[in-house]
Curated annotation (Swiss-Prot):
Residues involved in Mn(2+) binding: D16, H198, H200
Protein name: 4-hydroxy-2-oxovalerate aldolase 3
The keyword Metal-binding is assigned to this record: yes
GO biological process: catabolic process; L-leucine biosynthetic process
Active-site residues, Swiss-Prot/TrEMBL: H19
Domain Pyruvate carboxyltransferase stretches: 7-259
Residue runs in coiled coils: none
Residues at which substrate binds: R15, D16, S169, H198, Y289
Record EC number: 4.1.3.39
Protein keywords: Aromatic hydrocarbons catabolism, Lyase, Manganese, Metal-binding
Pfam families: DmpG_comm, HMGL-like
Catalytic activity: (S)-4-hydroxy-2-oxopentanoate = acetaldehyde + pyruvate
């Protein structure tokens, strides 16, 4: 890792932000955002469909521009930043990894539910064999205790993962809950792999939780410029960088340049601000996967029910990523109850 930072920041505006934009990024938008983030010193930029490689589908939403084309544009634009991609085993396939690398991406981020790390083993093996840097995502990390999360992290590390992330997919973790999980992974993995943290703003704690993760030993942190992500968005990179500057943590990112990028380049590409509104708040409170927001709003409108109530019910059922279709069942259930 370069000495220009104490921690490495990955900007996920062009992947997590795809949920908020309903996967409608254009090539020009990717070119502009990558150029601005790269100029500001962001070391890693993630680019894919919101649900990762292969996510463009009837169930998750179709991409306006094929994700592999967007990856190629990002690689051609970036002068210093590395381009990363996300994939969920079973949604994306191993051939997608090969194509993304052929298009110039150099960091493979593989995500599983926090109890299913074993499904990533062959994908990490392929990525390492091909010389890609590897990152693992343990999603919905709030839903199991730290010691169980650490055991899942060990599975990823043994498979070849070089950094395992505590992923607060629902934005449900609160401060010490982040620290406890990061510390558990640091203790389990030691020098075998780094630990990272990916947060959401659904309880307004994205930056605070990210700082808690850094203090607990995390070496890689995700964020999205202008909070451009699912739910209420991710930890805003510009705010996180500002806080890091104040507490003496080096990110290698220029605060003023990233603030300009957020205002002048990223915001114009957003369909609307990512808000901590009632629906997003309910996701954080009930522990609902952040990408469910737009799906819930669509089904609530279709069936004439409350999207907030729909999300709370989804939280009680402990739905996970990939179960978005069950929102229809819940909406019908609520509709019958309100007749």
């Amino acid at each position: 890792m370069s000495s220009s930072w104490d921690i490495r920041v990955t900007d996920t505006s062009l992947r997590d932000g795809s949920h908020h934009k309903r996967h409608q990024f254009t090539g020009d938008e990717v070119r502009a955002i990558v150029g601005a983030l790269d100029s500001a010193g962001v070391p890693v930029i993630e680019v894919t469909h919101g649900d990762g490689l292969g996510g463009s589908s009837f169930n998750y939403g179709f991409s306006k521009v094929p994700e592999q084309e967007l990856i190629s544009i990002a690689v051609d634009t970036a002068r210093n930043a590395k381009i990363a991609f996300l994939m969920l085993p079973g949604l994306g396939i191993k051939d997608d990894i090969i194509v993304a690398q052929d298009n110039g991406a150099s960091i493979c981020r593989i995500a599983t539910h926090c109890t299913e790390a074993d499904v990533s083993i062959q994908h990490f093996g392929l990525a390492r064999d091909r010389g890609l840097e590897t990152v693992g995502f343990l999603m919905m990390a709030h839903s199991i205790p730290p010691e169980k999360l650490a055991r899942q992290a060990r599975i990823m590390a043994d498979a070849g993962c070089q950094c395992v992330y505590v992923v607060d997919s629902a934005g449900a973790l609160v401060l010490e809950q982040v620290s406890d999980r990061v510390e558990a992974l640091v203790q389990e993995l030691g020098a075998d792999a780094q630990v990272g943290f990916h947060g959401h703003e659904n309880l307004g704690l994205g930056v605070a939780n990210s700082i808690a993760a850094v203090r607990a030993g995390a070496k890689q942190i995700d964020g999205s410029t202008r909070r451009f992500g699912a739910g209420a968005g991710n930890a805003p990179v510009e705010a996180f960088v500002g806080v890091c500057d104040k507490i003496g943590v080096k990110t290698g990112i220029d605060f003023f340049a990233i603030a300009d990028a957020a205002e002048d380049v990223v915001r114009p590409a957003m369909p609307a601000e990512c808000l901590l509104d009632r629906q997003a708040l309910m996701m954080g409170y009930a522990g609902v996967y952040s990408s469910f927001l737009k799906h819930a709003e669509r089904q609530a409108e279709r069936y004439g029910v409350s999207s907030a109530e729909l999300l709370v019910r989804a939280g009680k059922r402990k739905l996970v990523g990939g179960q978005e279709d069950q929102l229809i069942d819940i909406a019908l259930e609520l509709q019958r109850e309100h007749l």
